[in-house]
């Protein structure tokens, strides 16, 4: 592997481990990417030493171009980008403001969608960023395919619209953000809302959106709290 971007590689590796610790993907499925420039991104790759999402290290994170070729000499020796690299590439192409894409397979998100339970703003101060995210709508890409080529990725991006997240029916979740941290934390919020929705349904209840006046009263606690403190907690809780 070529040198460079040590801190960025570690951040992507930490993000993969956080996703696994939060149950967003089992085993070795799922990947996180970080835009480096207009043509290249860091992404968790497949290789002879990978051990699964929960044990991702910086050595699993490699620099590639948008076509999956090495982003620097020696970068992919013995490694290959994930099959769903086009998913990451097309989300980043369509969103100049996005720096990171997370693709995971959260069981609760898949189950809630298949049960007909949309991701709705059913909570308030329990998760303020999550409530606001859900209030804006969480769209669904209605195909359970492996998003392994540009055509399928463009379909998913079209379903995503202008929203930062999209549920992939029978498959998982794609989340984007202005940072790796934001993209992962958004995925955690969607998963949390899906889990709550399933618990409500199991108890015989029905989803009810937070009243509009309560939603409007929720403050923006700022990135220092919503992202900074939240991310330090996610990394620390892994031990």
UniProtKB/Swiss-Prot annotation:
EC code: 4.1.1.69
Lyase keyword on record: yes
Active site (UniProt): 84 (proton donor/acceptor)
Names of the cofactor(s): a divalent metal cation
Pathway where it operates: Xenobiotic degradation; phthalate degradation
Top EC class, one word: lyase
GO CC terms, sorted: cytosol
Gene Ontology biological process terms, A to Z: pentose catabolic process
Catalytic reaction equation(s): 3,4-dihydroxyphthalate + H(+) = 3,4-dihydroxybenzoate + CO2
Keyword Lyase (UniProt): yes
Name this polypeptide is given: 3,4-dihydroxyphthalate decarboxylase
Source organism (scientific name): Terrabacter sp. (strain DBF63)
Keywords for the protein's UniProt record, in alphabetical order: Lyase, Metal-binding, Plasmid
Residue sites binding a divalent metal cation per the record: 84, 103, 105, 171
